[in-house]
C-alpha cells in the first residue's frame, strides 16, 4: 500500500474523496493485475492482443452511458470491438480496476489508525488461518450454554450494497459508475449465486462483488463493536481492507442497556448483565454463543433480527437462525462437527487414614469429521459412489502412473491436513481408504488389470506416499521433537497455515 501511495502522489483526503479520476490511470490496472490471483484475465482471452489503455477505458465508459449502447446487428458484432467476446473482457478490466481503487480508502483508514495509536502492531500471519478459530472455541465455548446458528442472507438488491458503500466512499461519480455497471451489465441473481453465474458475472465481478458484500457484512457486524466493552480477543490486522476473514469478538463484561442510543429500542430494551458473549463468522456462516438462559438467547435473536432488518435490510427467515444447546447438539462450522460434551473423571482423595473417590464431570469441546457429508462430496467428485464404495477416475486414466499417484496423494494429504483437528481419526482413516482404493482402481483400469493383481505386481509401497500420516510428516519435519510431539497426535493438531476451507469439506 505504501508503494501505491508514493505512486499516486495524492493527499489522503484527495484519495478518499476523488477516486473517479483514478479509473483513467493505466497504472491502476497494472496494480490490479499484479495483486490478482492466478493467471491474468488478459492472457485467457485469445482475441485480446493489446494492453488495457486509457483510450479503451474512456471509450467503454462513454458507451456505457449512451442510451443505445451495444445494440447492433450480428454482422456488426464481428467488427465492433465492444461487442461479443471482447465486451466481457472490457467489463472485467473496469471491474478489476474499480475493485482495486475502492479498496484504497479502507487501506488508508487502516494505516491511519495504526499511526494514530503510535505503536507498532505485530503482524501475525497466524491470524489469517481459519483454524485459529478452533483454539478460541476450545477455550471459551466449553463454558457456554446456548448458541445462535445464523446463516447470513444476501442483500435483497444491489442498491443496498451501493448505499452501504456511500458511508465509506464520498465520491459520487464512482458510486454512480458502480451502480450503473452492476445494474446494466450484471444479473443480480448471478452475483449472489456463483454456481449459476454467467461468464460476464462469475468471472468478472468476483472481487468487486466480494468487496461490496463484505463491506455490507461489516456494517451490520458493527453492532457487536458497539456492544463490547473490552478489546477483541484476537485482532484481525486485515479487517480494515475487508478481506474475507474470521472475525473475533471478545468477552463482554458489562452488558447493560446496550441499545439505549438506538431510537427504536430506547423505550423497551433493557438487558441484564451477561458476562460472556462470543461471536464468530466465516463467509455466510456466523455463530453467537452465550452463557445465559434459553430466554436470554431468544431475546437476543429477536432483538438482532429486528435491528438488522430495519437498519440494514437483512431479511432473515426463521429457518436461517437456530437456537441450539451446545451440550446436546452438534454445530457444523468450517467442515467440522463441534459440540460440548461431559467428560467424566474419577479422582481419588485421601485425608489422613480415610480415602474416598470423587466423580467429576468436565466440559470438553470436541471436533469431529462429518463422515456422511464428506462421502457425499467424494461421490460428487467421482471418487466413490453414494454408499462410499471407491470407484476409478476414467478422466485421469490417460495420465502417467506417477502423475495419478501424485494427484490422489495431494488430495489425501490436503484432507488429512485440514481435518487434523478431529478428535476421532476413524472417519479420517475411512476417507483415506476410499482415496487409496480409488487410486488403485484408476491405475488398474489404465493397465487393464484387477486391483489385487496390480498391487501384487507393483507392491503396496506404490501408494505409501499419500498414505503418510500427520505423525510421519511431523516426525520428518521435527526429528528431535518427534517423541515429545507424538503424544499430541492422538488428540488434535491445528495448523495455522490454512487460510481457506477445503473444497471437499465445503458442504453446500
Curated annotation (Swiss-Prot):
One of its GO terms (biological process) is tRNA processing. InterPro entries: Domain_X, Maturase_MatK, Maturase_MatK_N. Its main location: plastid. Keywords: Chloroplast, mRNA processing, Plastid, RNA-binding, tRNA processing. GO terms for cellular component: chloroplast. It holds the Pfam family MatK_N. GO terms for molecular function: RNA binding. It is found in: Plastid, Chloroplast. HAMAP family: MatK. PANTHER family: MATURASE K (PTHR34811:SF1). Usually encoded in the trnK tRNA gene intron. Probably assists in splicing its own and other chloroplast group II introns. Belongs to the intron maturase 2 family. MatK subfamily. This is Maturase K. It comes from Antirrhinum majus (Garden snapdragon). The gene is matK.
Amino acid at each position: 500500500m505504501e508503494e501505491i501511495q508514493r505512486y499516486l502522489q495524492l493527499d489522503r483526503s484527495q484519495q478518499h474523496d476523488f477516486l473517479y479520476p483514478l479509473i483513467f490511470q493505466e497504472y491502476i490496472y497494472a496494480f490490479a493485475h499484479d495483486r490478482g490471483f492466478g493467471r491474468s484475465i488478459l492472457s485467457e482471452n485469445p482475441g485480446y492482443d493489446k494492453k488495457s489503455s486509457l483510450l479503451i477505458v474512456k471509450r467503454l465508459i462513454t458507451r456505457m452511458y449512451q442510451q443505445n449502447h451495444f445494440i447492433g446487428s450480428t454482422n456488426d458484432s464481428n467488427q465492433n470491438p465492444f461487442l461479443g467476446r471482447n465486451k466481457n473482457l472490457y467489463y472485467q478490466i473496469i471491474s478489476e480496476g474499480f475493485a482495486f481503487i475502492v479498496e484504497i480508502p479502507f487501506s488508508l483508514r487502516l494505516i491511519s489508525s495504526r499511526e494514530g495509536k503510535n505503536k507498532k502492531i505485530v503482524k501475525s500471519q497466524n491470524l489469517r488461518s481459519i483454524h485459529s478459530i478452533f483454539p478460541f472455541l476450545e477455550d471459551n465455548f466449553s463454558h457456554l450454554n446456548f448458541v445462535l446458528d445464523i446463516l447470513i442472507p444476501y442483500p435483497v438488491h444491489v442498491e443496498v450494497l451501493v448505499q452501504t458503500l456511500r458511508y465509506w466512499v464520498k465520491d459520487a461519480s464512482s458510486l454512480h459508475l458502480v451502480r450503473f455497471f452492476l445494474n446494466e451489465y450484471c444479473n443480480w441473481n448471478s452475483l449472489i449465486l456463483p454456481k449459476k453465474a454467467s461468464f460476464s458475472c462469475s468471472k468478472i465481478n468476483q472481487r468487486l462483488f466480494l468487496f461490496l458484500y463484505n463491506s455490507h457484512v461489516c456494517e451490520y457486524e458493527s453492532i457487536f463493536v458497539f456492544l463490547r466493552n473490552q478489546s477483541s480477543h484476537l485482532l484481525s490486522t486485515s479487517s480494515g481492507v475487508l478481506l474475507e476473514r474470521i472475525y473475533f469478538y471478545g468477552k463482554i463484561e458489562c452488558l447493560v442497556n446496550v441499545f439505549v442510543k438506538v431510537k427504536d429500542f430506547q423505550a423497551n430494551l433493557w438487558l441484564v448483565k451477561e458476562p460472556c458473549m462470543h461471536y464468530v463468522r466465516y463467509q455466510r456462516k456466523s455463530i453467537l454463543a452465550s452463557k445465559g438462559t434459553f430466554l436470554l438467547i431468544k431475546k437476543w435473536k429477536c432483538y438482532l433480527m429486528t435491528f438488522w432488518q430495519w437498519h440494514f435490510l437483512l431479511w432473515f427467515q426463521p429457518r436461517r437462525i437456530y437456537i441450539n444447546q451446545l451440550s446436546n447438539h452438534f454445530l457444523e462450522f468450517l467442515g467440522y462437527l463441534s459440540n460440548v460434551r461431559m467428560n467424566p473423571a474419577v479422582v481419588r482423595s485421601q485425608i489422613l487414614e480415610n480415602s474416598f473417590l470423587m466423580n467429576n464431570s468436565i466440559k470438553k469441546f470436541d471436533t469431529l469429521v462429518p463422515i456422511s457429508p464428506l462421502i457425499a462430496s467424494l461421490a460428487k467428485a467421482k471418487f466413490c459412489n453414494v454408499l462410499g464404495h471407491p470407484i476409478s477416475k476414467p478422466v485421469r486414466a490417460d495420465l502417467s502412473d506417477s502423475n495419478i499417484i501424485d494427484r490422489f496423494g495431494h488430495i489425501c494429504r490436503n484432507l488429512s491436513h485440514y481435518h487434523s483437528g478431529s478428535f476421532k481419526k476413524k472417519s479420517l482413516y475411512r476417507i483415506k481408504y476410499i482415496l487409496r482404493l480409488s487410486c488403485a482402481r484408476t491405475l488398474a483400469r489404465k493397465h487393464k488389470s484387477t486391483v489385487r493383481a496390480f498391487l501384487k505386481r507393483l507392491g503396496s509401497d506404490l501408494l505409501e506416499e499419500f498414505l503418510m500420516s500427520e505423525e510421519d510428516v511431523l516426525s520428518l519435519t521435527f526429528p528431535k521433537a518427534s517423541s515429545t510431539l507424538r503424544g499430541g497426535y492422538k488428540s488434535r493438531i491445528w495448523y495455522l497455515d490454512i487460510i481457506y476451507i477445503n473444497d471437499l469439506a465445503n458442504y453446500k
